[in-house]
């Protein structure tokens, strides 16, 4: 399963804007734009699976909200601190979306 939430990243929004402009000019059809977005979803998921090796830890003062729907967990944390090696970042509120990393071998 390829999730679409990576489309909300800067790269994903820029891709969507570019595809919208190309459709407005008549350079591509909506069907082609959708195929590009589906390929983007799959490529991002594959790249993170194959090359995402960074480790990070975090703590939070409070777990404000949590929910699970269709194997997608959403967590809202208050007063969180993220640490990686010598770097740390403190934030007032953070939203974490965690998805099932495999599709039971059906890729």
From Swiss-Prot:
Family to which the UniProt record says this protein belongs: Belongs to the TFIIA subunit 2 family.
GO CC, any one term: transcription factor TFIIA complex
CDD domains for the chain: TFIIA_gamma_C, TFIIA_gamma_N
Source organism: Drosophila melanogaster
Sorted UniProt keywords: Nucleus, Transcription, Transcription regulation
Function: TFIIA is a component of the transcription machinery of RNA polymerase II and plays an important role in transcriptional activation. TFIIA in a complex with TBP mediates transcriptional activity.
Name under which the protein is recorded: Transcription initiation factor IIA subunit 2-2
Subcellular location field: Nucleus
Quaternary organization: TFIIA is a heterodimer of the large unprocessed subunit 1 and a small subunit gamma. It was originally believed to be a heterotrimer of an alpha (p30), a beta (p20) and a gamma (p14) subunit.
Gene Ontology biological process terms from the UniProt entry: RNA polymerase II preinitiation complex assembly; transcription initiation at RNA polymerase II promoter
Superkingdom as given in the UniProt entry: Eukaryota
Chief location: nucleus
Disulfide topology: none
GO molecular function, one term: RNA polymerase II general transcription initiation factor activity
